[in-house]
């Protein structure tokens, strides 16, 4: 029997709600453009043009000791931004009480331990859902209820024909009883009377201080709403009483909820005593229903009882039933690492609920929509000269003021610290290598100055200011080859290099004018991973190589080694210093003659020898045998400490704020730890060397390079040939890095600037060539580290929920400050000289390992060493045979090995062509692998994307709901796959 209030029809909605302030309603009648009930991310909601529905918090309360000591206890629940309170009212005979709450996942109050349990996935009994449906079908349904207080709301839901005035008064007094929350003191605190309610005062309507200061409030996002579910057994009720209310405007219902939030929903489930936990389980079922995003989306738009029941039926169709005896219902299922997508549930909901539909996308289309450059407006040809450059400028100018204002955040400070140290280390490392490769024509000072000038200019004018310019391994290889060529043909190196730079700038400008950057659409994951793996291996190789070189500078002293002998000579009548000099080195360790005044220094250390008036003699007197081992200790300490601190963010230790701080400043803390350890022991480890004088490394040359010098004029024309190869290298290096940084899964809002970036690099090539400074291009690893240090994640995270990736903090200031500090480092030598070089080498190793471990290529290499039964459940292994996966990985390994061999041999002059050849190899793979396999192993090229329907991929992967695994994982929102530890 449906119970209605007198005059209920006056406020029961006949259409979708109109007064929801969060704007959930769809004003567009077009069913193809409506909001999605999924709402897994704010970004998707913005793409659809509607706000996201609020999160749902659910709280379960229990009444103890009725009627002598009326007291409510919370048992609770919450889901993303709707707060629900569920009060459970047992009868006189019920003395036990349960405490639960849901903040996206269920938490149970451990009464004995006095704490909340770990969040877990709630499980329900199927009969409780069926009984709940029956009770709601026969109960009271009020939509757009105008109640403005708890008293008005209680009067509305209890004004039913089946209740006598006396029972109605008792029930109202019970519902108006102030609940006893977990964080409050015990004792009965009645709200508004005992048997008959009275008008509430302003103080009684105001939320309590405990509600406003509840720590749980910080875990709920702004705009969160509350819903209340009251369920329980009352002996004085003769028949069940059910009511579901949706308030027209959200209202704060006094101290009813644990957290002070405006309430939107109210559900009442009462009835006479029954065996078991019938109403308790029905209350849990109602709370779980309201925490479900699909049900919540439907009930917000429901216009009558039929819509409400249809939403519940849709939920029942999605329920998974576990057979009895095969699963313990009391077992707690831990939260998944990544929440499943709701897209696969759309078809069933669209069949049941009248409302805006969501257009269906095939998984293939969606995969490319989230690809690195699919449908990117920056990569569309305009057909005009410099058309792409003009479009990039027009696109970036409106964002220019915000590029500086968005940097006013503490996170940017930590990013500056780490990227500055990484940039300085890179400048010193590559400056030293460049000095060795060019016999001092360029050195550390030129590296510092060039990094500061080129990097700062690029950050101010580039289309993607998050890019960090630096010397790179491939460009260094080309510089070495160019210097060797100049020396072999007796050419003046810097003037010849100037003409090469002029030609490179010219070729790059031609590429900009002809919009050649649109060719990056052919740079698929195969090319990106090959290049990224090569750069990461260069970082690892250089870090380990530099560390091993320290063992030559500071050799390890082995016991009994004759090369490190040390004797103490005492002046005396028989002492003959000339005899020591004439003694062969191999025989000096055997000389322990008092006639010569010599004593083995192992018995008398050199400082003691000097104090007693002797003279230490021998090559081992001034050798500190611990430097090599201690440098290795600093190297490994900085590496492992940075890795450990980065992993703290996802660990169980410390509060979330502390974990995030340690993770953000992991590299800086690792460097400080290494410096402190070095200062504590006081060993003479090699320190960071910063130039102290502002003058060119090569004596006798000025800051401007003469165009000709001693070279014949025709060499200025011949320089075009090596410049062509270098242009290919610059284009590939710059654009591959740009493609990686501008992938759509990074959720960049300000757009890319492929043409503008290449134009800036061309101008800087001309400037650095004229000043005799190193050439600079986008540094893949450091740029990725820069972006990773600026990751934005949601602050409000429910217990058990991982922070949602929101995007990157896009701005220009961090890079600009980094390069200004790099230039000023020449004047910071008194401070920087205390940083040990092994510590910086450890950070270099850390960056290379983190970048290498974050790409899919590395995971596929691991599969080569795993038996099939121990392999992880990767999505690609469900759709591609394992032998085909191994074949694809083997081809990538062969290409990577070939690139490394060519880079390390005199044939490195063709290294740029080999990078370009990666695109050709990927194109040839279309003859070896099917489009279906390439779709999962790599990405399809533009021609393959257009032919997807023709090749039959769409029917196989179409989103039909039957293949739940594909549908869920294909639409799974993911953060960028880079895990480079930065600050």
Curated annotation (Swiss-Prot):
<dbReference type="Pfam" id="PF00955">
    <property type="entry name" value="HCO3_cotransp"/>
</dbReference>
<dbReference type="InterPro" id="IPR016152">
    <property type="entry name" value="PTrfase/Anion_transptr"/>
</dbReference>
<feature type="transmembrane region" description="Helical">
    <location>
        <begin position="837"/>
        <end position="857"/>
    </location>
</feature>
<keyword id="KW-0812">Transmembrane</keyword>
<protein>
    <recommendedName>
        <fullName>Anion exchange protein 4</fullName>
    </recommendedName>
</protein>
<feature type="glycosylation site" description="N-linked (GlcNAc...) asparagine">
    <location>
        <position position="600"/>
    </location>
</feature>
<feature type="transmembrane region" description="Helical">
    <location>
        <begin position="624"/>
        <end position="644"/>
    </location>
</feature>
<feature type="transmembrane region" description="Helical">
    <location>
        <begin position="443"/>
        <end position="463"/>
    </location>
</feature>
<comment type="function">
    <text>Electroneutral Cl(-)/HCO3(-) antiporter that favors chloride ion entry and efflux of hydrogencarbonate and sodium ion across the basolateral membrane and may participate in salivary secretion. Also mediates Cl(-)/HCO3(-) exchange activity in the presence of K(+) as well as Cs(+), Li(+), and Rb(+). Does not contribute to Cl(-)/HCO3(-) exchanger in the apical membrane of the upper villous epithelium.</text>
</comment>
<dbReference type="GO" id="GO:0005886">
    <property type="term" value="C:plasma membrane"/>
</dbReference>
<feature type="region of interest" description="Disordered">
    <location>
        <begin position="332"/>
        <end position="357"/>
    </location>
</feature>
<dbReference type="InterPro" id="IPR003020">
    <property type="entry name" value="HCO3_transpt_euk"/>
</dbReference>
<feature type="region of interest" description="Disordered">
    <location>
        <begin position="946"/>
        <end position="983"/>
    </location>
</feature>
<dbReference type="GO" id="GO:0015701">
    <property type="term" value="P:bicarbonate transport"/>
</dbReference>
<keyword id="KW-0472">Membrane</keyword>
<keyword id="KW-0039">Anion exchange</keyword>
<dbReference type="GO" id="GO:0046541">
    <property type="term" value="P:saliva secretion"/>
</dbReference>
<dbReference type="GO" id="GO:0008510">
    <property type="term" value="F:sodium:bicarbonate symporter activity"/>
</dbReference>
<feature type="transmembrane region" description="Helical">
    <location>
        <begin position="415"/>
        <end position="435"/>
    </location>
</feature>
<keyword id="KW-0325">Glycoprotein</keyword>
<dbReference type="Pfam" id="PF07565">
    <property type="entry name" value="Band_3_cyto"/>
</dbReference>
<feature type="transmembrane region" description="Helical">
    <location>
        <begin position="899"/>
        <end position="919"/>
    </location>
</feature>
<dbReference type="GO" id="GO:0140900">
    <property type="term" value="F:chloride:bicarbonate antiporter activity"/>
</dbReference>
<keyword id="KW-1133">Transmembrane helix</keyword>
<feature type="region of interest" description="Disordered">
    <location>
        <begin position="1"/>
        <end position="48"/>
    </location>
</feature>
<dbReference type="GO" id="GO:0140892">
    <property type="term" value="F:sodium,bicarbonate:chloride antiporter activity"/>
</dbReference>
<dbReference type="GO" id="GO:0051453">
    <property type="term" value="P:regulation of intracellular pH"/>
</dbReference>
<feature type="transmembrane region" description="Helical">
    <location>
        <begin position="500"/>
        <end position="520"/>
    </location>
</feature>
<feature type="glycosylation site" description="N-linked (GlcNAc...) asparagine">
    <location>
        <position position="183"/>
    </location>
</feature>
<dbReference type="InterPro" id="IPR011531">
    <property type="entry name" value="HCO3_transpt-like_TM_dom"/>
</dbReference>
<feature type="transmembrane region" description="Helical">
    <location>
        <begin position="665"/>
        <end position="685"/>
    </location>
</feature>
<keyword id="KW-0050">Antiport</keyword>
<feature type="compositionally biased region" description="Basic and acidic residues">
    <location>
        <begin position="946"/>
        <end position="957"/>
    </location>
</feature>
<keyword id="KW-0813">Transport</keyword>
<feature type="transmembrane region" description="Helical">
    <location>
        <begin position="530"/>
        <end position="550"/>
    </location>
</feature>
<feature type="glycosylation site" description="N-linked (GlcNAc...) asparagine">
    <location>
        <position position="979"/>
    </location>
</feature>
<dbReference type="GO" id="GO:0016323">
    <property type="term" value="C:basolateral plasma membrane"/>
</dbReference>
<comment type="similarity">
    <text>Belongs to the anion exchanger (TC 2.A.31) family.</text>
</comment>
<feature type="transmembrane region" description="Helical">
    <location>
        <begin position="815"/>
        <end position="835"/>
    </location>
</feature>
<feature type="glycosylation site" description="N-linked (GlcNAc...) asparagine">
    <location>
        <position position="576"/>
    </location>
</feature>
<dbReference type="GO" id="GO:0045177">
    <property type="term" value="C:apical part of cell"/>
</dbReference>
<feature type="transmembrane region" description="Helical">
    <location>
        <begin position="758"/>
        <end position="778"/>
    </location>
</feature>
């Amino acid at each position: 029997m449906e119970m209605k209030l007198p005059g209920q029809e006056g406020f029961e909605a006949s259409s979708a709600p109109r007064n929801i302030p969060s704007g959930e309603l769809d004003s567009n009648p077009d069913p193809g453009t409506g909001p999605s009930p999924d709402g897994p991310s704010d970004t998707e909601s913005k793409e659809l043009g509607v706000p996201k529905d609020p999160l749902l918090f659910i709280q379960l309360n229990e009444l103890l000791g009725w009627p002598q000591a009326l007291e409510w206890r919370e048992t609770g629940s919450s889901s993303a931004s709707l707060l629900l309170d569920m009060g459970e009212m047992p009868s006189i005979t019920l003395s036990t009480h349960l405490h639960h709450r849901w903040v996206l996942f269920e938490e149970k109050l451990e009464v004995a331990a006095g704490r909340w349990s770990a969040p877990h996935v709630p499980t329900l009994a199927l009969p409780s859902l069926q009984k709940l449906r029956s009770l709601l079908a026969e109960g009271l349904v009020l939509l757009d209820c105008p109640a403005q207080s708890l008293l008005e709301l209680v009067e509305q839901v209890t004004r039913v024909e089946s209740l006598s005035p006396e029972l109605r008064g008792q029930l109202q007094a019970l519902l108006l009883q102030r609940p006893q929350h977990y964080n409050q003191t015990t004792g009965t605190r009645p709200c508004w009377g005992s048997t008959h309610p009275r008008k509430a005062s302003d103080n009684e309507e105001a939320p309590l201080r405990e509600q406003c200061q509840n720590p749980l409030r910080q875990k709920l996002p702004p705009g969160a709403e509350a819903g209340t579910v009251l369920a329980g057994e009352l002996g004085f009720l003769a028949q069940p009483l059910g009511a579901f209310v949706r308030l027209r405007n959200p209202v704060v219902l006094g101290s009813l909820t644990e957290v002070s939030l405006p309430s939107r929903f109210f559900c009442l489930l009462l009835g006479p005593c029954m065996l078991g936990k019938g109403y308790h389980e029905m209350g849990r079922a109602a709370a779980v229903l309201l925490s479900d995003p699909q049900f919540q989306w439907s009930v917000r738009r429901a216009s009558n009882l039929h819509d409400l029941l249809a939403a519940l039926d849709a939920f029942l169709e999605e329920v998974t039933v576990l057979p009895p005896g095969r699963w313990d219902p009391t077992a707690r299922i831990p939260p998944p690492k990544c929440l499943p997508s709701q897209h696969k549930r759309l078809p069933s909901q669209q069949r049941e609920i009248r409302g805006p539909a969501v257009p269906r996308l095939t998984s293939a289309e969606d995969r490319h929509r989230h690809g690195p450059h699919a449908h990117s407006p920056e990569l569309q040809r305009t057909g005009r000269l410099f058309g792409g450059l003009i479009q990039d400028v027009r696109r970036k100018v409106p964002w220019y003021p915000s590029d500086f204002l968005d940097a006013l955040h503490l996170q940017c400070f930590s990013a500056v610290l780490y990227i500055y140290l990484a940039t300085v280390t890179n400048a010193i490392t590559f400056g030293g290598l460049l000095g060795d490769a060019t016999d001092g024509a360029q050195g550390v000072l030129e590296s510092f100055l060039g990094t500061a000038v080129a990097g700062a200019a690029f950050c101010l004018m580039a289309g993607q200011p998050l890019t960090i310019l630096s010397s790179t391994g491939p460009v260094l290889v080309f510089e070495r080859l160019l210097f060797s060529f100049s020396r072999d043909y007796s050419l003046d190196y810097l003037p010849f290099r100037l003409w090469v730079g002029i030609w490179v700038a010219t070729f790059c400008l031609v590429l900009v004018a002809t919009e050649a950057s649109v060719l990056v659409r052919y740079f698929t994951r195969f090319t990106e991973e090959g290049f990224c793996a090569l750069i990461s291996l260069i970082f690892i190789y250089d870090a380990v190589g530099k560390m091993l070189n320290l063992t030559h500078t500071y050799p390890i002293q082995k016991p009994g080694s004759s090369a490190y002998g040390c004797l103490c000579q005492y002046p005396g009548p028989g002492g003959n210093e000339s005899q020591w000099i004439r003694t062969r080195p191999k025989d000096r360790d055997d000389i322990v003659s008092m006639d010569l005044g010599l004593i083995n220094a192992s018995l008398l250390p050199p400082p003691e020898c000097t104090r007693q008036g002797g003279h230490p003699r021998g090559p081992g007197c001034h050798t500190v045998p611990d430097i090599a081992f201690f440098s290795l200790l600093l190297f490994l300490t900085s590496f492992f400490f940075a890795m450990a601190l980065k992993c703290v963010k996802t660990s169980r230790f410390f509060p979330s704020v502390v974990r995030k701080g340690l993770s953000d400043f992991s590299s800086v803390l690792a460097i400080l730890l290494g410096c402190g350890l070095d200062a504590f022991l006081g060993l003479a480890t090699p320190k960071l060397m910063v130039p102290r004088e502002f003058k060119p490394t090569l004596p006798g040359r000025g800051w401007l390079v003469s165009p000709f010098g001693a070279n014949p004029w025709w060499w200025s024309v011949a320089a075009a040939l090596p410049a062509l190869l270098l242009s290919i290298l610059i284009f590939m290096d710059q654009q591959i890095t740009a493609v990686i940084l501008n992938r759509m899964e990074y959720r960049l809002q300000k757009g890319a600037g492929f043409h503008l970036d290449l134009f800036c690099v061309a101008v800087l090539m001309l400037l650095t060539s004229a000043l005799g400074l190193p050439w600079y291009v986008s540094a893949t690893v450091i740029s990725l580290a820069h972006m990773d240090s600026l990751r934005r994640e949601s602050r409000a995270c429910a217990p058990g929920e991982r922070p949602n990736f929101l995007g990157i903090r896009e701005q220009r200031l961090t890079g600009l400050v980094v390069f200004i500090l790099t230039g000023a480092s020449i004047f910071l030598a008194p401070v920087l000289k205390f940083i040990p070089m092994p510590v910086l080498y450890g950070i270099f190793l850390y960056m290379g390992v983190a970048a290498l471990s974050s790409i899919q290529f590395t995971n596929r290499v691991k599969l080569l060493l795993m038996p099939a039964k121990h392999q992880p459940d990767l999505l690609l292994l469900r759709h591609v045979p394992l032998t085909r996966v191994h074949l694809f990985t083997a081809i990538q390994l062969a290409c990577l090995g070939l690139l490394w061999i060519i880079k390390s041999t005199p044939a490195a002059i063709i290294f740029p062509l080999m990078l370009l050849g990666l695109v050709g190899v990927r194109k040839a793979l279309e003859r070896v692998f099917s489009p279906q396999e390439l779709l999962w192993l790599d990405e399809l090229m533009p021609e393959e994307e257009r032919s997807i329907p023709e090749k039959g991929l769409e029917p196989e992967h179409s989103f039909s709901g039957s293949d739940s695994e594909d549908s869920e994982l294909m639409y799974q929102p993911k953060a960028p796959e880079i895990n480079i530890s930065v600050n």
